[in-house]
């Protein structure tokens, strides 16, 4: 019998218990041994629940129990999760976590400790919820040079942008609806300002590069400045606006960014709607591949965590995960990265077109009949630095959105 402890009995923690209890027979068959939850760590009591007699308030009880072979961290946040996870690994216990903040900040260190102790630190659920992406990158696709990962990694913002596109609603209205449905927190900044997606792409970037990609080094822009009029231009061009998190190889560097982008119908991420997530992966041998599914939610995320528990249980005395170095990878300078840009500008297109072309070079003009006193245009491919230099000469610019190739 393999005994585990679950740290945290919130949404994901209760989901982990539910998955194990519901699918216990098939889980045990896949492990080849019975799995038992011995402890659930939480500050609260849960009378009348399946974990009523498993609750402990003392982490040291778990740490000092040699019967506990796997610790499941689903508390969230950095502390005390980091301390508990590190102590568990140093004590020879494998860890499965869904904590993206923990993995993004301390993943390199925790993976190294696990490797030194011939145990595992597993984190499939930290990116994409129930979408399997970590294990494919660390096992199935290890024969490939991964050239690009671009994803819709936050369900809240994808839901909001989908509503704005399909219903013509403005940002504030769809945010309130997302909060009412439980998709967005009372303080939605982690989602709408792009921080959640940033941590996730930092983890994926670290995996494919083998070095630490610091989330604080990734240029991050959320959707708070996306207005209903931006959506009207997108529709006029036959495109959609998506919050994309991407990392692309540029020589020996990575170009990593989180930002709203205009996406053409031919792009695999164009059709991803509502709260769903999707991750586009391009390998030099694989070609293009897509991973799609529920990127959050109690049971999809818990399912991914339990998948890691099963892997840890099957490999109790063997470290099976690849790691990344603690040495930071230098990212491509934002000013050097190249793409097309969509620009909204106050004024009359006929009056300003010549000046725009003289500064920006060839552009494709875009006009929306119902929007008076402004127009839009799409530039040719240019560097971010060049765009900024050109844009500085036009105080009439209302907004800019990058165009995903």
What is the predicted role of each segment?
Residues 260-284, 298, 359-371, 381:
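Low-complexity, glycine/alanine/valine/leucine- and proline-rich hydrophobic stretches
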Residues 1-90:
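N-terminal glycine-/serine-/threonine-rich beta1-alpha1-beta2 phosphate-ribose binding loop
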Residues 81-87, 91, 98-137:
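Rossmann-fold NAD(P)-binding glycine/threonine-rich loop
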Residues 268-323, 330-338:
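ATP-dependent carboxylate/acyl-activation modules
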Residues 68, 115-196, 203:
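Rossmann-like NAD(P)H-binding beta-loop-alpha module
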Residues 55-56, 96-98, 121-125, 148-151, ...:
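General beta-strand structural signal in soluble alpha/beta enzymes
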Residues 309-405:
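A conserved regulatory-domain signal marking ACT and ACT-like small-molecule sensing domains
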